[in-house]
């Protein structure tokens, strides 16, 4: 665990405020006070000095204005279902800009102190890591074990409204364990003392109501605080279950145990036997329940990866309820199949690309729109959709052919031609200015990913 240092409780400096103002994004909607981020960015040196005094006053006293503890929730319709039903809207919390600035200064100190303490299992909200890391890890585990003729057992756990269910007292205990205490802890807690929210629909604003549980939505501190909270869950589960998960061995001879992969609250439990997976699931559920997190049994799935397709069924239960066994699971947006066939994922990505292309059909086939604008849409929307997670693929000739067919479909739409026109593919590429093929982009991504893996520290995976 990190050591609680003097730097964490030192006065807030002018440089910290300047850096926090600099990284804040402009163009964000202000809260009820009407103060926008641009006001701080354009304020100059004097504004930074006044902000530094104000933030230090709050830091020393351990108290923040009520406006900083208030959230204005604006419901946004999801696009389906009855608009009058709350479950069909997503609430966006608008917070005071100066309060967000203060939170950014605090969480930077906490991150610097605790980043090295969080386990390698967690890739959410961490610098230099992302969904691709976890997707790659899942595929590699399956590939290596299946190559040895061994089965891999997965449980993809769904935590119901995890952010909103975090027990604050448990969170404070976790922060103390990670060396966050004294004035810094009180500063974080000050945002949660009598925190409140209201709902704004159009020009109408509801009465204020108190929020007593969960992390603050829209607060820059919340993602990292949640990481620390979940790392506490991981540690407790690992300490309780002996001989857990999988044993992984490096070429250097170093070995470690892998039982969980996390991206924020997306949790995948893994073991080399059904019995071990049952123990992991049971212990994970127990720890979550003790910390007042609820596992959604209906949305949690289990899967057995095997070379023969896993003809025999597995029975994993949580609180007496049987978790559904699936043949394929969409993990972090990527299809994981029980026989680990990349073909399934490529088909899925092409299907998603077709949906995007269909939505853009009227634009892509518009003869009055310039080719440069069409290329921009293709490069910025279509390509990222199709090649999401391509770094983890091992594409064969059939997958390359499938990608090429989809690509030419897009380019013909951009060029305003069809197969009936019998125009050579190279001519279509020349007309659209798209010389680099999708399969070449996949190869480039794989090579770039290889470099990323080579640059990782020895303790990373």
Model features per residue range: what roles?
Residues 10, 14-22, 50-57, 105-110, ...:
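Inter-domain linker/hinge segments that demarcate the starts of reverse transcriptase
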Residues 56, 104, 108, 162-186:
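Catalytic-core region of right-hand nucleic acid polymerases
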Residues 1-86, 93, 101, 118, ...:
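Surface-exposed loop/turn segments and immediately adjacent short secondary-structure elements
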Residues 27-35, 73, 84-94, 132-176, ...:
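Conserved catalytic palm subdomain of right-hand nucleotidyl-transferase polymerases, strongest
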Residues 21, 77, 110, 142, ...:
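Residues that mediate protein self-association or partner binding, especially
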Residues 3-8, 17, 182, 199-219, ...:
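Short linear motifs embedded in intrinsically disordered, charge-biased segments
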Residues 87-118, 136, 163, 212-243:
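Conserved pre-motif C helix in the palm subdomain of viral-like polymerases
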Residues 1-17, 63, 68-72, 112-165, ...:
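Active-site-proximal segment of RNA-dependent polymerases
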């Amino acid at each position: 665990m990190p050591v609680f240092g003097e730097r964490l409780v030192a006065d807030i400096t002018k440089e910290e405020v300047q850096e926090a103002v600099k990284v804040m994004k402009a163009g964000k909607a202000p809260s009820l006070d009407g103060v926008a981020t641009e006001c701080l960015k354009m304020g100059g040196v004097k504004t930074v000095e006044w902000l530094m005094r104000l933030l230090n006053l709050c830091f020393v006293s351990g108290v923040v204005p009520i406006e900083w503890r208030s959230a204005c929730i604006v419901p946004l319709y999801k696009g389906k279902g009855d608009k009058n039903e709350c479950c069909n809207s997503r609430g966006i919390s608008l917070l005071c800009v100066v309060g967000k600035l203060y939170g950014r200064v605090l969480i930077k100190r906490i991150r610097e102190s605790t980043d090295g303490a969080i386990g390698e299992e967690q890739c959410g909200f961490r610098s230099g890591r992302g969904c691709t890391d976890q997707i790659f890890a899942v595929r590699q585990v399956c590939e290596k074990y299946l190559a040895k003729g061994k089965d891999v057992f997965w449980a993809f756990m769904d935590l119901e409204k995890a952010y909103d269910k975090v027990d604050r007292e448990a969170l404070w205990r976790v922060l103390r364990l990670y060396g966050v205490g004294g004035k810094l802890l009180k500063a974080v807690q000050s945002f949660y003392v009598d925190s409140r929210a209201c709902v704004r629909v159009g020009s109408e604003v509801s009465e204020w109501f108190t929020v007593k549980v969960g992390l603050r939505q829209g607060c820059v501190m919340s993602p990292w605080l949640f990481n620390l909270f979940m790392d506490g869950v991981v540690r407790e589960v690992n300490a309780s279950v002996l001989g857990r998960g999988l044993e992984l061995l490096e070429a250097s001879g170093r070995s470690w145990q892998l039982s969980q992969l996390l991206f924020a609250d997306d949790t995948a439990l893994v073991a080399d036997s059904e019995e071990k997976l049952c123990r992991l699931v049971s212990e994970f559920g127990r720890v979550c329940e003790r910390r007042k997190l609820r596992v959604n049994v209906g949305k949690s799935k289990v899967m057995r990866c095997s070379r023969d397709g896993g003809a025999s069924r597995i029975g994993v239960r949580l609180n007496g309820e049987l978790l559904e066994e699936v043949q394929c699971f969409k993990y972090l947006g990527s299809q994981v199949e029980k026989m680990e066939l990349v073909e399934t994922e490529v088909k899925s990505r092409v299907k998603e690309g077709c949906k995007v292309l269909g939505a853009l059909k009227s634009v892509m086939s518009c003869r009055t729109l310039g080719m440069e604008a069409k290329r921009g849409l293709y490069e910025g929307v279509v390509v990222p959709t199709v090649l999401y997670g391509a770094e983890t693929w091992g594409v064969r000739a059939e997958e390359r052919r499938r990608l090429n067919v989809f690509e030419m479909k897009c380019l013909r739409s951009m060029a305003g031609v069809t197969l009936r026109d019998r125009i050579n593919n190279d001519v279509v590429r020349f007309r659209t200015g798209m010389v680099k093929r999708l399969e070449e982009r996949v190869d480039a991504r794989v090579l770039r990913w290889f470099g990323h893996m080579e640059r990782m520290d020895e303790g990373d995976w």
